[in-house]
């Protein structure tokens, strides 16, 4: 299984997963992540598939990207977390919350909304 690249700031059991927008990468959130880590979060800045230093694949939809996040959390032994998604990352985060509601403590979406 291919794994997602990430930068982790902080070392607590309060996990905040940050999912960037289209054509972005986790590192785009580093300034905010440093602040959140200082506030007691363990912040995971993830490069989603086909972005940053993560693997590239012709398979590219929100359900698959939600599965990528589940594999990442399993690999890191994270049972439940707060997920913050921006733009495309927000769609991934919402899909993850629908597919794996037991893994989401809180869901934050920015600059995106669900279709009605």
Q: Could you tell me what each predicted segment is?
A:
Residues 1-17, 38-41, 78-79:
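Alpha/beta-hydrolase fold catalytic core
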Residues 13, 21-24, 87:
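Active-site glycine-rich loops that stabilize anionic/oxyanionic intermediates
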Residues 18-21, 45:
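Structural cue for short, hydrophobic secondary-structure segments
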Residues 23, 48-52, 114:
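Alpha/beta-hydrolase active-site loop signature
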Residues 23-31, 43:
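Serine-hydrolase catalytic-loop signature spanning alpha/beta hydrolases and amidase-signature enzymes
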Residues 30, 70, 94-98:
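Short, hydrophobic alpha-helix immediately C-terminal to the catalytic nucleophile
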Residues 35-38, 42-84:
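Active-site loop/oxyanion-hole signature of alpha/beta-hydrolase fold enzymes
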Residues 79-116:
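Conserved hydrolase catalytic core segment
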């Amino acid at each position: 299984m291919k794994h997602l690249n990430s930068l982790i700031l902080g070392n607590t059991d309060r996990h905040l997963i940050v999912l960037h927008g289209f054509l972005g990468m986790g590192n785009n959130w580093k300034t905010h992540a440093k602040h959140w880590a200082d506030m007691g979060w363990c912040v995971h800045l993830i490069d989603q598939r086909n972005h940053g230093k993560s693997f590239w694949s012709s398979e590219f939809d929100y359900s698959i990207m939600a599965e990528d996040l589940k594999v990442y959390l399993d690999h890191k032994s994270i049972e439940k977390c707060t997920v913050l998604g921006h733009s495309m990352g927000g769609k991934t985060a919402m899909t993850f919350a629908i597919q794996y509601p037991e893994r989401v403590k809180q869901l934050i979406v920015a600059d995106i909304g669900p279709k009605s």
